[in-house]
Curated annotation (Swiss-Prot):
InterPro entries: Ankyrin_rpt-contain_sf (IPR036770), UPF0507/Ank_repeat_27 (IPR051248), VPS9 (IPR003123), VPS9_dom_sf (IPR037191). This is UPF0507 protein YML002W. It comes from Saccharomyces cerevisiae (strain ATCC 204508 / S288c). Belongs to the UPF0507 family. It comes from the Eukaryota.
Length: 737
């Protein structure tokens, strides 16, 4: 008979119903409504309709004919009074059997099972058969009796097709009910009597949620092993979850790690059986969560995969590491932070959060901070997690430690960091590090930095401080164990201030510099200034290239497409083919890796500019000033020798002698002139000594800074920045593979 689809109210699924079921439903509705004179109503509808054709054809005609079948059923039922008694008997027998099969009944046997043979085909309103009811209520002895004694009434074909209204097979029902004994019985029957094709078809049947039996196998290790090779591991339910995904996210099982490992191995074997490699992307759900996102422990089984994007975001923008940090999965954090493919500071697009923003526990911060140290410029220190407590800003600092643990994470007030930078600046006034810039930026920190734009500035500042203190530790300007706690920093600052105050001032014993020494210093500084200026220009070009490389690549792609279109229109095939061989570098570099390299280049450029400015001041201000005063000093000496050729040296103002009155007057004028020249020569000599001493000290410190800078520059650009850029770029590009 034809089947029709019943339209249900909003919120309910449509249900397909055949004609036999529809008539039974109609009979039930008539009985419940206690409708009288049913035949009269039918006669009226058939003969007194405004349009007689409407009662014979179409939907209304189908409804009238169904009502006629119901009336005939009642007439036939009334004629044969034995049917009522038979129906009542069957009803009582069914009720008795269901009472024995109910979960409230402690008995697990039916002694007179043969008396119920004629009602073993019963199904309830959920579509459950007698077998399904036995399974659901854990009546396994009765189930075995029925299957063994009435094998002809329940052939394997019927067992394979036995489903409830929601599409649950007997095996699904047994797993859902936790009846593992019944499940093993059914599996044994299937394995013994079914072909592989039938097994695959049965095990991968889905219910109304598109779930197969494998989606419910979250604790049943033995069953998983017995049917695992027949499971379609790529089959997704209505939430987009594969069986493997469902097992991975079932956290309440006692043998979670073993279950996960077994399921993964079986799935891997299934892929190989189908001549393919395990594809990680097959197991992403409708929310963008991957297997890495949901795995609670034992992630090394996934990290061994080559085609694995460990930085993949779900639709909320969360990476697997962010999920682990949020839910404090320490073993996963420990494993994933050791993987070189990890991009630690990947940002959640909607909130601009990094994994550090989800960390609420010190042990978690320490774990991810250790990876930050390893990724830092020289692998010595890492600033992260700026927090506000009342009006004070604090930051977590993870650094290399000499203690029992290789790394230590401490919370330090930003004002303490600011004071530390000031102390270092006083000890190293010619440092190439732009410490004054960082001191000013720390002064401007406030709670408004919690906005998205503010977070960008804070992140940039923390990166700069990380680079700065990495260089200071690399050059041994500060002790390695300085950041064990805030008290250590304050103590070191006090000791350092005390030592600085005890040092004698260079102004007390100024050094006399000779022109030859100044010439040597000038030549040395000019050579270094030229080299630094050349390198600074190269850094400037590199910075601009990094900023515009992707934009220029896009422009080039657009221009190439235009040329390609023109080439297609050329009649000459040789000329046309010339437009097809251009290879571009479009999308060769990820924005994330370019941004990281750009940050390091900017830092190196800032350091270069800072050092260049110090050299420039000495080379183009201090030394020319010394030569100017030296020329004046020589001119004064020349004037003195010319005016007083017989004087060995200029007299002091205290020298006196007896003179005649007129001769004394002339001599007095002469002595006054000599004394003026002597004072000028003395002042010029003092100025030369001060300038010379200043240049000498500056030269010594600049020479040391230039040496430190060269060492830092090579390590920063070659060994760290470029290697980190390549590593990050490869990690990001793997996402697109």
């Amino acid at each position: 008979m034809d089947s029709h689809q019943l339209e249900l109210p909003d919120g309910l699924n449509n249900m397909t119903m055949d004609a036999d079921t529809l008539i039974s439903l109609f009979v039930l509705v008539v009985c419940r409504s206690e409708q009288k004179h049913l035949k009269s109503h039918l006669y009226y509808l058939q003969n007194f309709s405004n349009n007689s054709s409407s009662t014979k054809f179409g939907i209304l005609g189908y409804a009238v004919s169904t009502l006629e079948a119901v009336v005939c059923y009642f007439e036939d039922f009334n004629k044969n009074t034995g049917n009522v008694a038979k129906a009542n008997t069957l009803c009582e027998k069914t009720k008795n059997l269901l009472d024995k099969l109910s979960c409230e009944n402690p008995t697990n046997e039916v002694e007179d099972l043969a008396t119920y043979k004629d009602i073993l085909t019963y199904r309830n309103e959920q579509g459950q058969s007698i077998l399904s009811i036995c399974i659901t209520n854990h009546k396994n002895y009765i189930l075995l009796d029925i299957l063994s004694e009435y094998e002809n009434d329940f052939p394997v074909e019927d067992l394979l097709e036995d489903e409830t209204i929601d599409g649950s097979t007997l095996l699904i029902e047994s797993i859902k009910a936790g009846n593992l004994e019944a499940a093993k019985v059914l599996i044994k029957i299937m394995l013994f009597n079914c072909t592989e094709e039938e097994l695959v078809s049965y095990i991968n049947k889905t219910d109304k949620y598109a779930r197969t039996v494998a989606h419910y196998l979250t604790h049943e290790m033995d069953i998983l092993k017995s049917i695992g090779n027949y499971i379609d591991w790529k089959r997704k339910n209505s939430s987009g979850q594969t069986p493997l995904f469902s097992i991975f996210r079932s956290y309440d099982q006692p043998n979670y790690e073993e279950m996960v490992k077994t399921a993964f191995d079986i799935a891997n074997t299934w892929y190989r059986k189908h001549n393919s490699l395990f594809d990680y992307l097959d197991h992403t759900d409708n929310k963008g969560n991957s297997l890495l996102h949901v795995l609670k422990t034992n992630i090394p089984i996934l990290l061994q995969l080559t085609k694995l994007d460990i930085n993949e975001e779900n639709y909320k923008g969360l990476t697997p590491l962010m999920v682990y940090v949020k839910y404090k999965r320490l073993s996963n954090i420990d494993a994933i932070t050791k993987d070189r493919r990890l991009i630690l500071e990947k940002v959640q697009n909607s909130t601009f959060f990094t994994c550090f923003d989800y960390a609420k526990d010190h042990s978690v911060l320490s774990k991810i901070g250790e990876r930050g140290v390893k990724d830092s410029l020289f692998g010595l220190i890492y600033f992260h997690s700026l927090r506000y407590h009342n009006l004070n800003a604090t930051t977590n600092i993870t650094s290399v430690s000499n203690a029992e643990k290789p790394f230590a994470t401490t919370v330090i007030n930003m004002k303490t960091i600011q004071g530390l930078l000031r102390s270092i600046l006083k000890d190293n006034p010619f440092t190439f590090l732009p410490l004054n810039t960082y001191i000013d930026e720390i002064s401007h920190l406030n709670r408004s930095d919690l906005t998205i734009i503010g977070k960008t500035d804070v992140t940039s500042l923390l990166h700069q401080l990380t680079n700065c203190f990495n260089v200071l530790l690399f050059l041994k300007k500060i002790p390695e164990n300085l950041f064990t706690d805030e008290a250590s920093i304050l103590y070191w600052m006090r000791i350092n201030t005390s030592k600085r105050n005890q040092k004698p001032s260079g102004k007390e014993n100024p050094k006399t510099m000779e022109p030859e020494e100044i010439n040597m210093i000038q030549s040395f500084l000019r050579f270094n200034f030229d080299e630094i200026s050349s390198f600074k220009a190269s850094l400037n070009i590199l910075r601009k290239v990094l900023i515009f490389i992707n934009l220029k690549s896009d422009d080039f792609e657009d221009a190439y497409k235009g040329l390609n279109e023109m080439g297609r229109k050329l009649i000459n095939s040789e000329a046309s083919s010339a437009f097809k061989g251009i290879i571009t570098n479009h999308n060769m570099f990820s924005e994330l890796s370019l941004a990281a390299l750009l940050e390091n280049v900017r830092f190196l450029e800032q350091c270069t500019i800072q050092l260049s400015s110090f050299v420039q001041i000495i080379l183009f201000e201090k030394i020319p000033n010394w030569w100017k005063h030296y020329g004046e000093f020589l001119a004064l000496h020349k004037s003195y020798r010319k005016a007083f050729p017989n004087m060995v040296k200029p007299k002091s103002a205290s020298d006196t002698s007896s003179r005649a009155p007129l001769g004394g007057f002339i001599e007095t004028k002469r002595e006054q002139s000599e004394q003026r020249l002597a004072v000028q020569i003395k002042a010029s000599s003092k100025m030369l000594k001060e300038l010379g001493s200043e240049i000498f000290v500056a030269h010594e410190r600049l020479a040391e800074e230039l040496s430190n800078y060269m060492e830092f520059r090579k390590a920063c650009l070659d060994q760290r920045s470029l290697v980190a850029f390549a590593t990050t770029n490869i990690s990001v590009l793997q996402e697109c593979v």
